[in-house]
UniProtKB/Swiss-Prot annotation:
Cited InterPro entries: Get1 (IPR028945), Get1_fungi (IPR027538), Helix_hairpin_bin_sf (IPR029012)
Family the entry assigns: Belongs to the WRB/GET1 family.
Cell compartments where the protein resides: Endoplasmic reticulum membrane
Species for this entry: Coccidioides immitis (strain RS) (Valley fever fungus)
UniProt-listed Gene3D superfamilies: Helix hairpin bin
Listed name of the protein: Protein GET1
UniProt topological domain (Lumenal) ranges: 1-4, 132-155
Coiled-coil portions: 39-95
Length: 210
């Protein structure tokens, strides 16, 4: 089993990545991946997309058909359009319910695996030291702060270690972002080819000089 030190660090790394990428972006990506799986929801989504294409096709055919000159054909298209539209709305409503349930499940898993787990560990392991400090290296006042609130004196508590992890992960993420921006700005740019106007102007300038 991984140590408490590593578990707390991983929780803060995952939390930082979720906040950086965006929870809504992750939810949308997971929903798209879920629809790729062979399940009832993916079948409903495929049927919904098929009905949407059919509704649009029937709409175009209705617009291209005169309701006065070709009333029988137009009325037949209208009935097909209304029936298909009703089926599409039913599938769309069912898919919306599936997505709401999926989003709720994803949000619950994300909360309990990050914030919920962090709060539980801080409560359950409040007396468990993350690691011990060398004796006599720092004043006892500092040892008391590092062991706050309930860890043994001379050790680092899970609350203090969690704060350190959050700060270090945030600084590391900012540093990586700065390095990425720097490398992107220093990337060699392709030389733009000279325009035809510039090429034609050069011989004329040479002739004038001669």
């Amino acid at each position: 089993m991984p140590s408490l030190l590593i578990i707390v660090l991983i929780i803060h790394v995952v939390t930082y990545l979720i906040n950086t990428i965006g929870a809504n972006t992750i939810d949308s990506l997971l929903w798209l991946l879920y629809l790729k799986l062979p399940n009832q929801t993916s079948q409903t989504a495929n049927e919904q997309r098929r009905l949407k294409r059919e509704v649009m096709q029937l709409k175009r055919e209705m617009n291209a058909t005169s309701s006065q000159d070709e009333f029988a054909k137009w009325a037949k298209l209208r009935r097909r359009h209304d029936k298909t539209m009703e089926e599409y709305e039913a599938k769309n409503k069912a898919l919306g319910k599936h997505k709401s349930s999926f989003d709720l499940a994803v949000k619950s898993i994300r909360f309990f695996s990050t914030t919920g787990l962090k709060l539980f560990l801080q409560f359950w392991c409040s007396k468990t030291p993350i690691f011990e400090l060398p004796r006599g290296w720092i004043p006892w006042q500092v040892e008391w702060v590092l062991s706050f609130p309930r860890a043994p004196l001379g050790t680092v508590s899970i609350q203090i270690w969690g704060g350190v992890c959050a700060t270090v992960v945030s600084l590391a993420g900012d540093a990586i972002g700065v390095v990425n921006v720097y490398l992107t700005s220093k990337a060699p740019k392709q030389k733009e080819p000279a325009t035809s106007g510039e090429n034609s102007a050069r011989p004329m300038a040479i002739k004038k000089e001669l």
